[in-house]
Amino acid sequence: MVYSKQSDDNFVKIDTLPTYYKNAVIAVEDHRFEKHGAIDFIAIGRAIVRNISNFKLLEGGSTITQQVANNLYFIEEDVNPILRKVAEIFVAFDLEKQYSKNEILELYINTIYFGNGYYGVKEACNGYLNKDPKDMTLYDATMLAGIPNAPSVYAPTVNPDLTRSRQEKVIQSMVKYGYLSQEEADKLILNDN
Protein backbone atom coordinates (compact mmCIF):
# COMPACT_ATOMS: atom_id res chain seq x y z
CA MET A 1 0.00 0.00 0.00
CA VAL A 2 1.18 3.52 -0.72
CA TYR A 3 1.78 6.20 1.88
CA SER A 4 -1.35 7.52 3.53
CA LYS A 5 -2.03 10.31 5.98
CA GLN A 6 -4.47 7.90 7.59
CA SER A 7 -3.66 5.39 10.29
CA ASP A 8 -4.75 1.82 9.67
CA ASP A 9 -7.58 2.36 12.18
CA ASN A 10 -9.04 5.11 10.00
CA PHE A 11 -8.69 3.37 6.64
CA VAL A 12 -12.12 2.37 5.32
CA LYS A 13 -12.50 -0.45 2.80
CA ILE A 14 -14.63 0.82 -0.05
CA ASP A 15 -16.91 -2.22 -0.05
CA THR A 16 -18.07 -1.30 3.48
CA LEU A 17 -19.42 2.07 2.32
CA PRO A 18 -22.92 2.70 1.01
CA THR A 19 -22.97 2.71 -2.79
CA TYR A 20 -24.69 6.10 -2.78
CA TYR A 21 -21.64 7.68 -1.12
CA LYS A 22 -19.34 6.38 -3.87
CA ASN A 23 -21.85 7.56 -6.48
CA ALA A 24 -22.07 11.02 -4.90
CA VAL A 25 -18.27 11.37 -4.93
CA ILE A 26 -17.98 10.30 -8.56
CA ALA A 27 -20.91 12.49 -9.67
CA VAL A 28 -19.50 15.66 -8.15
CA GLU A 29 -15.73 15.10 -8.42
CA ASP A 30 -15.17 13.20 -11.66
CA HIS A 31 -18.30 11.95 -13.42
CA ARG A 32 -16.23 10.35 -16.19
CA PHE A 33 -14.05 8.46 -13.67
CA GLU A 34 -14.92 5.01 -15.04
CA LYS A 35 -14.44 6.12 -18.67
CA HIS A 36 -11.06 7.84 -18.74
CA GLY A 37 -7.54 6.93 -17.75
CA ALA A 38 -5.34 8.84 -15.36
CA ILE A 39 -6.26 12.18 -16.87
CA ASP A 40 -9.43 13.40 -18.56
CA PHE A 41 -8.54 15.40 -21.65
CA ILE A 42 -12.16 16.51 -22.08
CA ALA A 43 -12.28 17.97 -18.55
CA ILE A 44 -8.89 19.64 -18.98
CA GLY A 45 -9.95 21.19 -22.29
CA ARG A 46 -13.23 22.42 -20.79
CA ALA A 47 -11.38 23.92 -17.80
CA ILE A 48 -8.85 25.69 -20.02
CA VAL A 49 -11.56 27.21 -22.23
CA ARG A 50 -13.66 28.30 -19.26
CA ASN A 51 -10.70 29.75 -17.37
CA ILE A 52 -9.37 31.65 -20.40
CA SER A 53 -12.78 33.00 -21.40
CA ASN A 54 -13.36 34.29 -17.85
CA PHE A 55 -9.78 35.55 -17.36
CA LYS A 56 -9.48 33.72 -14.05
CA LEU A 57 -9.11 30.27 -12.57
CA LEU A 58 -12.67 29.01 -12.11
CA GLU A 59 -12.20 25.27 -12.35
CA GLY A 60 -9.58 22.59 -12.58
CA GLY A 61 -9.53 19.48 -14.67
CA SER A 62 -8.05 17.06 -12.16
CA THR A 63 -9.38 13.54 -12.07
CA ILE A 64 -9.88 11.53 -8.91
CA THR A 65 -6.66 9.69 -9.82
CA GLN A 66 -4.73 12.97 -10.06
CA GLN A 67 -6.12 14.04 -6.71
CA VAL A 68 -4.95 10.75 -5.19
CA ALA A 69 -1.50 11.32 -6.68
CA ASN A 70 -1.44 14.79 -5.18
CA ASN A 71 -2.72 13.63 -1.78
CA LEU A 72 -0.25 10.77 -1.49
CA TYR A 73 2.95 12.10 -2.98
CA PHE A 74 3.02 15.88 -3.02
CA ILE A 75 3.29 17.24 0.48
CA GLU A 76 5.40 20.33 -0.28
CA GLU A 77 3.22 23.35 -1.04
CA ASP A 78 6.13 25.54 -2.16
CA VAL A 79 6.90 23.47 -5.27
CA ASN A 80 6.45 25.22 -8.62
CA PRO A 81 2.76 24.59 -9.48
CA ILE A 82 3.46 23.73 -13.12
CA LEU A 83 6.18 21.23 -12.23
CA ARG A 84 3.93 19.81 -9.53
CA LYS A 85 1.06 19.34 -11.99
CA VAL A 86 3.33 17.60 -14.52
CA ALA A 87 4.69 15.29 -11.83
CA GLU A 88 1.14 14.65 -10.60
CA ILE A 89 0.13 13.54 -14.11
CA PHE A 90 3.02 11.07 -14.31
CA VAL A 91 2.20 9.67 -10.88
CA ALA A 92 -1.48 9.41 -11.87
CA PHE A 93 -0.54 7.32 -14.93
CA ASP A 94 1.51 5.06 -12.67
CA LEU A 95 -1.38 4.70 -10.20
CA GLU A 96 -3.73 3.71 -13.05
CA LYS A 97 -1.29 0.93 -13.98
CA GLN A 98 -0.95 -0.36 -10.42
CA TYR A 99 -4.50 -0.08 -9.08
CA SER A 100 -8.06 -0.75 -10.19
CA LYS A 101 -10.55 2.11 -10.36
CA ASN A 102 -12.15 0.77 -7.18
CA GLU A 103 -8.79 0.81 -5.37
CA ILE A 104 -8.09 4.35 -6.59
CA LEU A 105 -11.48 5.51 -5.34
CA GLU A 106 -10.74 3.80 -2.01
CA LEU A 107 -7.44 5.68 -1.75
CA TYR A 108 -9.23 8.92 -2.60
CA ILE A 109 -11.92 8.61 0.06
CA ASN A 110 -9.30 7.73 2.65
CA THR A 111 -6.85 10.57 1.91
CA ILE A 112 -9.00 13.52 0.87
CA TYR A 113 -9.20 16.47 3.26
CA PHE A 114 -12.62 17.34 4.71
CA GLY A 115 -11.67 20.36 6.81
CA ASN A 116 -11.39 20.64 10.62
CA GLY A 117 -8.30 18.42 10.52
CA TYR A 118 -10.30 15.45 9.17
CA TYR A 119 -8.53 13.34 6.57
CA GLY A 120 -10.59 10.60 5.02
CA VAL A 121 -14.23 9.65 5.19
CA LYS A 122 -13.98 7.90 8.56
CA GLU A 123 -12.66 10.96 10.38
CA ALA A 124 -15.20 13.17 8.58
CA CYS A 125 -18.12 10.88 9.46
CA ASN A 126 -17.01 10.60 13.06
CA GLY A 127 -16.30 14.31 13.39
CA TYR A 128 -19.23 15.86 11.54
CA LEU A 129 -21.91 13.19 11.95
CA ASN A 130 -20.85 11.22 15.02
CA LYS A 131 -21.33 7.97 13.14
CA ASP A 132 -19.44 5.26 11.35
CA PRO A 133 -19.13 5.63 7.55
CA LYS A 134 -21.12 2.44 6.90
CA ASP A 135 -24.05 4.04 8.75
CA MET A 136 -24.20 7.28 6.76
CA THR A 137 -27.52 8.08 5.10
CA LEU A 138 -27.94 9.33 1.54
CA TYR A 139 -28.40 12.80 3.01
CA ASP A 140 -25.11 12.46 4.93
CA ALA A 141 -23.33 11.10 1.85
CA THR A 142 -24.33 14.04 -0.34
CA MET A 143 -23.20 16.51 2.31
CA LEU A 144 -19.83 14.81 2.82
CA ALA A 145 -19.17 14.39 -0.91
CA GLY A 146 -19.42 18.16 -1.37
CA ILE A 147 -16.90 19.19 1.27
CA PRO A 148 -13.50 18.29 -0.31
CA ASN A 149 -13.92 20.77 -3.18
CA ALA A 150 -13.27 23.61 -0.70
CA PRO A 151 -13.19 22.35 2.90
CA SER A 152 -12.59 25.79 4.40
CA VAL A 153 -15.82 26.95 2.74
CA TYR A 154 -18.08 23.88 2.69
CA ALA A 155 -17.39 22.26 6.07
CA PRO A 156 -20.69 22.31 8.01
CA THR A 157 -18.98 23.88 11.01
CA VAL A 158 -17.92 26.88 8.89
CA ASN A 159 -21.07 27.94 7.06
CA PRO A 160 -24.11 25.63 7.13
CA ASP A 161 -25.85 27.60 4.36
CA LEU A 162 -22.92 27.13 1.95
CA THR A 163 -22.66 23.48 3.00
CA ARG A 164 -26.34 23.03 2.12
CA SER A 165 -25.94 24.84 -1.21
CA ARG A 166 -23.00 22.64 -2.14
CA GLN A 167 -24.95 19.55 -1.03
CA GLU A 168 -27.75 20.49 -3.43
CA LYS A 169 -25.16 20.73 -6.22
CA VAL A 170 -24.01 17.20 -5.35
CA ILE A 171 -27.62 15.98 -5.42
CA GLN A 172 -28.26 17.59 -8.81
CA SER A 173 -25.02 16.10 -10.16
CA MET A 174 -26.26 12.69 -9.04
CA VAL A 175 -29.48 13.28 -10.99
CA LYS A 176 -27.60 14.55 -14.04
CA TYR A 177 -25.38 11.46 -14.19
CA GLY A 178 -28.11 8.92 -13.46
CA TYR A 179 -27.42 8.05 -9.82
CA LEU A 180 -30.70 9.53 -8.51
CA SER A 181 -34.08 10.30 -10.03
CA GLN A 182 -35.33 13.89 -9.89
CA GLU A 183 -38.10 12.71 -7.58
CA GLU A 184 -35.56 11.20 -5.15
CA ALA A 185 -33.51 14.39 -5.32
CA ASP A 186 -36.52 16.61 -4.63
CA LYS A 187 -37.46 14.52 -1.58
CA LEU A 188 -33.89 14.65 -0.34
CA ILE A 189 -33.65 18.42 -0.75
CA LEU A 190 -37.02 19.01 0.94
CA ASN A 191 -36.46 16.43 3.66
CA ASP A 192 -33.45 18.24 5.14
CA ASN A 193 -32.28 14.91 6.58
Positions of PLM-derived features:
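Juxtamembrane regions of bacterial inner-membrane/periplasmic proteins
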Residues: 1-193
